[in-house]
Amino acid sequence: MNEHQQETHLPIALALLRDNELAIAALYGEYALLFPTQASFWLTLAEEEQQHATWIGDLGHALNDSLTAAGPRFSPAAIETFTRYVHEQSALARRKGLSSMAALTTSYYIETALIERRFFEQLPTRDPAVARVMTELKRSTAQHVRKVEGALHQSRPGSF
């Protein structure tokens, strides 16, 4: 893949990642509806995923000035596949076909997936503001992992 093709794919990949974050936020919103006693937990995660989508959108706007091309190791199709998985999980939640433990396990899988991390590792930037946004995304995702891990450890029959 030449440099021009990489630069062409970068805005597409960022848009897909933004859509992926919005899909995750919607999934967590479904979980909040499905598990009302845990709604606060899920709604907090959903709001934070919406913030991630905003940050990724901001990265897209900064693209022309400060981001270099993503490496050829990353495929927009990988993001699309992952987003399809998230949509399937939302459909399952709407059918009320899962337990709280299954929702937490799915969330853990989503939060620990390498899709976002690998992408951002390939975005060297000359702009300190963009670098801060990428660092904040990494930090926030790590927080989500800790929150979900804590909920998984707490989650026993009759507790959350």
Regions found by a protein language model. Give the residues of each.
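Non-heme di-metal
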Residues: M1-F160
